[in-house]
């Protein structure tokens, strides 16, 4: 069933005890179906569960559940070359009834799947962002590094405003000083300069598995990788900037508007060479076109 029944006092409904993951299964060039780095997603869910005091699903249970869902929905895995994939959404919620502010004693772990089309409907094109200085996604020592529902609820107002104003989403800054870049919408951020892949380091940023993979690919391509604070003022020094995450893999950015300072940072109208190479390499690994030398894919046979 696509519906669940729970007590109206379940902690997920009152106190936000909810964590989730986002991952994909691909049909490769060889016809085989593979999931991309599911063990990393499992570890991140365990981290999220610890962050809001929920029972932790074991790694193997998590991965086996995802495999089972893919097998049961095998006919919905899009064909190779379509640019589409089967999206998986593992969810962990507190279902135990609890009126006081305490962790639940019962939890539900579930996984659903749905086919999704290619993210870039009209080709791999850059997008525009604006800086959100009047909204914070997460506090420095809060839940920003966990994939929990509250972080996304906190981004809805600013995200919808950005879309209404013609932007893809907004750039969130560090909540303490509003001078450093945290995230790009629901994705991580990276910039390229002097053959270096630079991505923010902060306790309020969700550790992206896509970003982790791109860092490794950048090193494989002979680039230097820096994980460090990135000030807003440094944007003008980057040759390329982009957002990265499960949905798009890489979303090149060609414009970032800073309303407070009435300043617009601009890049090329077409995706940069490095961003394109990173995107094509990671996509190639996911669908079996490029050798998976780090053994990231888990086959579903």
Model segments located where?
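Helix-start/capping segments and mature chain N-termini
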Residues: 1-65, 69, 91, 98-301
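Extended, Lys/Arg-enriched charged tracts that mediate electrostatic binding to polyanionic substrates
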Residues: 78-93
């Amino acid at each position: 069933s696509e519906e669940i029944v729970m007590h109206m006092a379940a902690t997920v409904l009152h106190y936000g005890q909810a964590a989730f993951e986002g991952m994909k299964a691909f049909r490769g060039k060889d016809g085989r179906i593979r999931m991309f780095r599911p063990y990393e997603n499992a570890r991140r869910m365990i981290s999220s569960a610890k962050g809001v005091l929920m029972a932790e699903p074991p790694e193997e249970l998590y991965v086996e559940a995802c495999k089972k869902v893919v097998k049961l929905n095998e006919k919905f895995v899009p064909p190779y070359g379509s640019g589409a994939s089967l999206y998986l959404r593992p969810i962990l919620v507190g279902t135990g009834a609890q009126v006081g502010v305490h962790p639940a004693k019962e939890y539900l772990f579930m996984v659903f799947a749905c086919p999704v089309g290619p993210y870039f409907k009209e080709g791999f094109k850059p997008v525009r962002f604006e800086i959100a200085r009047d909204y914070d996604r997460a506090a420095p020592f809060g839940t920003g590094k966990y994939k929990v529902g509250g972080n996304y609820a906190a981004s809805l107002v600013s995200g919808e405003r950005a879309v209404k104003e013609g932007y893809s989403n907004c750039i969130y800054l560090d909540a303490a000083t509003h001078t450093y870049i945290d995230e790009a919408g629901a994705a991580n951020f990276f910039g390229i300069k002097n053959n270096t892949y630079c991505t923010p380091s902060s306790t309020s940023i969700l550790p992206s598995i896509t970003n982790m993979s791109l860092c490794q690919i950048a090193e494989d391509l002979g680039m230097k990788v820096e994980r460090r604070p990135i000030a807003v003022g440094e944007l003008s020094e980057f040759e390329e900037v982009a957002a990265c995450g499960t949905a798009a893999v890489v979303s090149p950015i060609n414009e970032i508007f800073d309303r407070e300072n009435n300043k617009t940072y601009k890049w090329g109208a077409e995706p940069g060479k490095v961003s394109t190479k990173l995107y094509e390499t990671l996509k190639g690994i996911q669908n079996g076109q490029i050798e998976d030398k780090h053994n990231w894919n888990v086959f579903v046979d």
